[in-house]
Amino acid sequence: MNNVKSGGRPVAIVAERYVVEKEIGRGSFAVVYKGHLADSSAGNVAIKAVSRSKLRNKKLLENLEIEIAILKKIKHPHIVGLLECERTGTDFYLMMEYCALGDLTFFIKKRRSLMDKHPLVRTLFEKYPPPSEHHNGLNRVLVVNYLQQLSSALKFLRSKNLVHRDIKPQNLLLSTPLVDYNDPAEFHARGFVGIYNLPILKIADFGFARFLPNTSLAETLCGSPLYMAPEILNYQKYNAKADLWSVGTVLYEMCCGKPPFKASNHLELFQKIKKANDVIQFPKHAALESAMVDLICGLLTFEPAKRMGFTEFFSNGLVNEDLSPYEVESEPDLETKSKNVAESNMFISEYLPTAERNKRASPIRLGDSCTLRGPCESPQGADPYPQDNTQSDQHEHLHADYSFQVEMGQDGQQADGEEKRKLYNNQEERSNEERQFGQVSNGRNQEDQLLLHQGRGQIPCEQNRQALQSHSHVAAKQIPDKDSKSSVSCQKHAASAPTKNDHRTTRLKEKTKCSYSDLLLEKEYVVVEKKSVEVNALADEFAQAGSGAPAIRLPDQHHNDASQALQMARHSSTSVSAANTAKQTLLRRNSRTLSSSGASTSRRPSLVDRRLSITSLGATNALSKALGMASLRLFGNSHQQSSNGSSTFKQNPNVTSLLSPQTFQDMTENAVLSADHQWDNSRQADVLHDDSIMKALENLTAKVYAIYSFAEVKFSQIIPLPPSSTQDPYTHKRMSNGSCAIDDEEDDIEHSPGAETYRKNSSGANANTGNYNFSLDTIHEMNLNDLPPNDLYILCTEAIVLYMKSLSLLAYAMHLTSKWWHESADKICPLKLNLLVQWIRERFNECLEKAEFLRMKTQSIQLHNGNQLSASTMVSEPVFVEKLIYDRALDISKTAAKMEMQGEYLEGCEVAYSTSLWMLEALLDDVSDEDNYNDDNLGHTGVLDKSDKEVIKRYIDSIANRLKALRRKLSR
């Protein structure tokens, strides 16, 4: 892309012939601009710019390459065409057909506003008025017209053995009619179907498409949940019929103005679809003909085998209905307005009033520099920080990247503080960099798309970027306090002066919450959430299955607020530290029960909550004490224990003691010391037997525990726990450099810049109750004082790759468990296996959250301390997780050897040797391609060659021999 000057201002030129104009659409990985040919302002195009920096793993890059390859091969009048593609060192540019009327959602959800402002849309809906003012459904003529155009494109795709996998209104674009033709004959001669003077539907966004013959099955989770076939939602293999389900949902929405099924999460959506039992409910105001109802019901059939097939669909009466009678009468007004729209060179959203365009959520995440720097000027009068004035009864067309606030419309009433805190915390939890490419629609206006997506937003021009950066720190940190104060203020007002509007406000809040859930689900992509949901769903199934004994009861989902955990800590009658008490409470609550019951579940606790769960090893016997002491001395972390070396937990009557941290601790200790080292991936075919699956899980659990513990050390250095108020004979101070502090009894932390911050923040702690006043803001400030930005950035990077390695092993463990479970005839599992599965679920969710939190922290460091980060840090050698684990394993084994030679802490030496062995063996595990991760320099896998593995095997043999000799010594 080149920058030249035209008329005194810079102009961006792509492929030496396309001029870049305003931004008209935005997604997670791409920005769409309006453009035109350099030698003619009449040749409009849509320029899709994809930054290579956003495609941070192989899957995302593959999706883009697939989209380019498919669009190059297919040419159809009802599919958005690819005109040209250019690759540069930093970006991909796709020059595509320009669709000035946006996408189908504009006609459905913005119809009323557009009728007032858009001349072509007003004329169109005057001729084909909506069937009812009570819903947003379209006139039957428009519905059938677009149904036929959609079916024409699908028929072409099937002839090429292609399945789109993401058909939804946002990917159905509308182009201006009567632009380069004048009559029906010419219209149909060009291959178009339908009515010649209506906007023309075109399928867009092939980021998820793939070649899939009729006889083939796929199992990749793709698409948008509200329009996703149930077999995909349930992680079953699927075929091209999945597209027909999506067609059914689009057809239903065109008729009724809303999707057929709504839910707050994917599993609940699946349960609702299944519970409907193929009985589709239609709004009472939507008077549909029987043929339309039959077609929708045939497409929305739960079982793919019973669902209408392509042959039946393509031969349906509505799909083949003769629409020529609607073309008999000439419509000069439509033709004139179409040409005026084309000549005006305005995108559909530019016709909306500023207030309507700004009726969107306010961004609170900060973006990086714009992908494309050109003449992208903010529209005159547009607010660069649009506040959310969204009416709660209207489902706005938003990209649900969890980066917006919900406020209460024109009444000025804000959503309650708790709900807004959940929205804010959700930003910390979502993993956008794992989202698949393709969530871009041309049908979004420029102001709407000033949303700054979580951690990776893009701003269309340099001046906006600088302005937002100047407000970044304040915006990010003021939101929680602002929410709390607003909530308190509203509550006081309600208590002192109740009004007759209270009930209406309550209903408005409830509707806003529903709309929020709808928005999240409507646009959410779940390719990378597949494993997360699978892990939790399988663990739920195990927890409910039992094993002759009572089933493991799941955590109470109605009380997962961190404040309750702290309250419990404050009023505990036992002399247990606040951290231990909070750990017991949160551990019971943090199992994300995305249950198959269909009930809406609460959010995962935020990192502010979950930070409390990183506490001591609750030792109750000599072996546990040795493990706790050894981990403190060998790993050098700051975990605390109670004064007598044991922990007392206040048991929640709603949860059995089987889910207590002590049970998990004893189980993992046993796995580290006694799991079968002989099991490896080559024996995965044996997992159909109960004893084999147990050996496999114990083996993987031990490896995960060793690497996870190392990751926890890194995490505790980034966000340290407040010091325990109870003196512990095994307490060992953390070294700021992360080294093992075994031979060095003096600690530099007491004299570090962060030490005073520790003392200030722990001064309010009560020695008996463990009452800590510890906020996220304080932690952030303490961290920046404790470690320089360079060290903190490297530390975060190392912790991320360790958590990711743990995640890959945990996912593999659940894959083996799922295989055993679904091929088991009796569906009865041993209690120990059940506990292992619950532990794996706990660690998976925790590692996922912390890895995402750390990723955002690295971005925050770059944003706030970019000029302080040395160039060597930003361009240094990538962090290899294999080298981290290898070096740590050797350090642990060498330190244990010194202790053994001195005759000290022999039980701890046994744990150390075992831990070192598991870490080295984990390096030899083969990870499938889809589990590899490569996020810039965040974790490079698959780097060990044959000679490296031979070296590791020699160390494994050597350490194993020392461990055998030590155990013989201990048995005497």
Curated annotation (Swiss-Prot):
Locate the region Disordered.
359-394, 424-444, 467-506, 562-605, 743-764
- SMART domains linked to this entry: S_TKc (SM00220)
**Membrane topology, from the record:** Peripheral membrane protein
GO MF, any single term: ATP binding
Which SUPFAM superfamilies would you find in this protein's record?
Answer: Protein kinase-like (PK-like)
Q: Which stretches does UniProt call biased (Polar residues)?
A: 562-584
Assembly and interactions? Homodimer. Forms a ternary complex with ATG13 and ATG17.
User: Which residues participate in ATP binding?
Assistant: I24, G25, R26, G27, S28, F29, A30, V31, V32, K48
Spell out the reaction equation it catalyses.
Answer: L-seryl-[protein] + ATP = O-phospho-L-seryl-[protein] + ADP + H(+); L-threonyl-[protein] + ATP = O-phospho-L-threonyl-[protein] + ADP + H(+)
Please spell out the taxonomic lineage of the organism that makes this protein: Eukaryota, Fungi, Dikarya, Ascomycota, Saccharomycotina
Protein name (database record): Serine/threonine-protein kinase ATG1
Which BP terms from GO are recorded?
autophagosome assembly; cellular response to nitrogen starvation; cellular response to potassium ion starvation; cytoplasm to vacuole targeting by the Cvt pathway; mitophagy; piecemeal microautophagy of the nucleus; protein localization to phagophore assembly site; regulation of autophagy
UniProt feature, compositional bias: Basic and acidic residues: 424-436, 750-759
Question: Where primarily located?
Answer: cytoplasm
Task: Name which cysteines form disulfide bonds.
Answer: none
Domain named Protein kinase: residues: 18-319
Provide the active-site residues from the annotation.
D166 (proton acceptor)
Keywords, alphabetical:
ATP-binding, Autophagy, Cytoplasm, Kinase, Membrane, Nucleotide-binding, Protein transport, Serine/threonine-protein kinase, Transferase, Transport
> What CDD domains does the database record attribute to this sequence?
STKc_ATG1_ULK_like
